[in-house]
Amino acid sequence: MAPARRPAGARLLLVYAGLLAAAAAGLGSPEPGAPSRSRARREPPPGNELPRGPGESRAGPAARPPEPTAERAHSVDPRDAWMLFVRQSDKGVNGKKRSRGKAKKLKFGLPGPPGPPGPQGPPGPIIPPEALLKEFQLLLKGAVRQRERAEPEPCTCGPAGPVAASLAPVSATAGEDDDDVVGDVLALLAAPLAPGPRAPRVEAAFLCRLRRDALVERRALHELGVYYLPDAEGAFRRGPGLNLTSGQYRAPVAGFYALAATLHVALGEPPRRGPPRPRDHLRLLICIQSRCQRNASLEAIMGLESSSELFTISVNGVLYLQMGQWTSVFLDNASGCSLTVRSGSHFSAVLLGV
């Protein structure tokens, strides 16, 4: 019996079904040498293996449910990400070989333009002119005190000096009128507060006078003493070393000293042999250590043959004194009559330099 002939549509369906089966077989069976992508994705690398439990073998767990291919392709394994972070944590900034002393320099860009100015603050308080004048007076008083400290110390005796006289009106400006205050201020500003180079400061000086009359016998060498410091304008004393009782001045420092002595001498009773002879004379000396013959001394000689009953004899000069050496005034009466040195005769010294 002849087979029944199938229609053409059925034959086309069979051909299509065979092609689909062949294509499915080719895609599902990979090549023998090629590794499976799903297996490579499923198995972690050797270094990242987790410890296996007692129920797992070396080949893997006994049964693992299959995961969808599309979900596996788009997911990230947290364990793999953590292991990658651990391996990369000792590189870059956290590297062990990086020097701790060298800090990473931050690179900034170019500075931008300045911003707009801020708002203006509130106006300050209104200060009256009287307050400004009072504050200015306080500033001037401070400048005056600073100038007084810069000035040399005043002498023990004598006036306060021209500087103190010029500054005295300024200290009394509190009770004066405004016109007087302005005048004093202008006078103070006219005098420079910081003058130029000054003369060197005198560290040692004195001027003393004989307190009472001193009798000098004939043919005698007498050392004068018992002085006092005059309380008069122009008198001075600076530094230690003067013994008013003994009349000796001890040098406080070694240096060159300008010494001077002026004596007012009165003749006593006339000599028994008649008027003074030409060889009768007086010697006024300023000696070191009371050794007029051995040490250097200042000397003045005066004859008595033509002198009056009251006369003056002076001596001055410069001597170099070591520290601690003293000087004093001597009168050598080389005449046949006694003499009287009147009170008020003076002795002075000034340290010139070292």
Swiss-Prot record:
Residues 69-80 have a biased composition (Basic and acidic residues). It is found in: Secreted. Glycans are attached at residues 243, 295, 333. Residues 1-28 form the signal peptide. GO terms for biological process: establishment of localization in cell; fatty acid transport; intracellular iron ion homeostasis; negative regulation of apoptotic process; negative regulation of autophagy; negative regulation of BMP signaling pathway; negative regulation of gluconeogenesis; negative regulation of osteoblast differentiation. The modification Hydroxyproline is found at residues 111, 113-114, 116-117, 119. GO terms for cellular component: extracellular region; extracellular space. N-glycosylated; required for secretion of the mature protein. Residues 94-107 have a biased composition (Basic residues). Residues 26-123 are annotated as: Disordered. Keywords: Disulfide bond, Glycoprotein, Hormone, Hydroxylation, Secreted, Signal. InterPro entries: Adipolin/Erythroferrone-rel, C1q_dom, Tumour_necrosis_fac-like_dom. One of its GO terms (molecular function) is hormone activity. Residues 199-354 form the C1q domain. Residues 26-37, 51-62 have a biased composition (Low complexity). Its main location: secreted. Disulfide bonds: none annotated. The record marks 333 as: Required for correct protein folding in the endoplasmic reticulum. Residues 111-123 have a biased composition (Pro residues). Iron-regulatory hormone that acts as an erythroid regulator after hemorrhage: produced by erythroblasts following blood loss and mediates suppression of hepcidin (HAMP) expression in the liver, thereby promoting increased iron absorption and mobilization from stores. Promotes lipid uptake into adipocytes and hepatocytes via transcriptional up-regulation of genes involved in fatty acid uptake. Inhibits apoptosis and inflammatory response in cardiomyocytes via promotion of sphingosine-1-phosphate (S1P) and cAMP-dependent activation of AKT signaling. Homodimer; disulfide-linked. Forms trimer, hexamers and higher molecular weight oligomers. May form heteromeric complexes with C1QTNF2 and C1QTNF12 and, to a lesser extent, with C1QTNF5 and C1QTNF10. Interacts with BMP5 and BMP7; the interaction inhibits BMP-induced transcription of HAMP. Interacts with BMP6; the interaction inhibits BMP-induced transcription of HAMP. Interacts with BMP2. Interacts with heterodimers composed of BMP2 and BMP6 in vitro, the interaction inhibits the heterodimer binding to its receptor BMPR1A /ALK3 and thereby suppresses expression of HAMP. Belongs to the adipolin/erythroferrone family. This is Erythroferrone. The gene is ERFE.
